[in-house]
Amino acid sequence: MMKHNHLAGKRFLSLLLASALAFACTLPAAAVDPLGSGVMPTYDEAYYAMLDYYGNLTEGSVVKSYTLNGANSISDYGKYDSVNNLTDSTLHSTTGSKTTFDFGSTPPEHFYFEGKTTQPFETLPWTISMSYKLNGVPSNAEDLAGKTGVVEIDLNFVPNESASSYARNNYTLEAMAVFNQDDILSLKAEGAQVQLVGNLRIVLFLCLPGEEQHFTIEVGTNDFSFGGMTLLMVPATLS
């Protein structure tokens, strides 16, 4: 019974947009204030989004990892609905789109914080949608848990014209689904790499920069359950 909840759970589809240094450098110089000593903290960031059964955003946040390089404060620029310190008990102050953490005389070497925001989702390199069928008949995702037959999961990735030209031309999209071999009768996923790891079948799809792709996963089962999709968007090159 517990496995049925996987389909109905909030984490049905998760999206991870990882911003490597090349991407972070498209917004950087204004993102960190140099201190009077000339010390400049540096950071990496990642955008995380939780989506519903069909690809609609339910929650999003930016997580930033700062290396302080001896600085005793950081000032970050970004519009966040809320800010969470993931490192220590240091409180933040916010003025407009500027968030400041002042660490006093004992700054950490590395500092992490989360800024809740949905804004980056609108400019991801792809728009994402999913739909479902049971034995060839369109079905609501919420109705599929525990069903018998062939379940089709249709994935649609369309380049987003609202994304920056850099993101559209440089980011790849990787989509992954995992199925327990003991719980399924058959698995078909054209255009995917399917790997067997222990009793798990891992389905991997890839979209190259600027590509529109439509993929289908077909699962034969007597008792359908699905842990969801994990999506990763990263630059095609890290140089």
Predicted regions and their residues:
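Cytosol-facing boundaries of transmembrane alpha helices in integral membrane proteins
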Residues: 2-239
